[in-house]
Amino acid sequence: MSGKIKVTFIINDGEEKTVEAPIGLSILEIAHSNDLDLEGACEGSLACATCHVILEEEFYNKLKKPTEAEEDMLDLAFGLTDTSRLGCQIILTEELDGIKVHLPAATRNIKL
């Protein structure tokens, strides 16, 4: 399975959808290509928080720290947690194989 990893999306009702996803794409891109409801209003340009996702701590700790720009956008996210990230900023790597991504029940699109 070279070049692909397993990603499990956990939808707000607890339903799980596991997909095989190419390394190098973002969580936002994978969600869209699998018809999952993750908005991404700014199309990954770090101008909104509508692709806010919640990760399990094990995988959150494998990521590089969020940039200041991502942290600023996360401050606007509805239901922010200690392991919240923006789906557009999580690029899949081999070490993220098996990642579980919780899709929050609601997002907030704040236009400045």
Curated annotation (Swiss-Prot):
InterPro entries noted in UniProt: 2Fe-2S_ferredoxin-like_sf, 2Fe-2S_ferredoxin-type, Adrenodoxin-like, Adrenodoxin_Fe-S_BS, Beta-grasp_dom_sf
Cofactor: [2Fe-2S] cluster
Gene Ontology BP, a term: P450-containing electron transport chain
Reported function: Ferredoxin are iron-sulfur proteins that transfer electrons in a wide variety of metabolic reactions.
Pfam families: Fer2 (PF00111)
CDD domains in the cross-refs: fer2
Protein name per Swiss-Prot or TrEMBL: 2Fe-2S ferredoxin
Positions of [2Fe-2S] cluster binding: 42, 48, 51, 88
Cofactor descriptive note: Binds 1 [2Fe-2S] cluster.
Segments forming domain 2Fe-2S ferredoxin-type: 5-107
Family from the record: Belongs to the adrenodoxin/putidaredoxin family.
Organism of derivation: Rickettsia rickettsii
GO molecular function, one term: electron transfer activity
Keyword annotations from UniProtKB, A to Z: 2Fe-2S, Electron transport, Iron, Iron-sulfur, Metal-binding, Transport
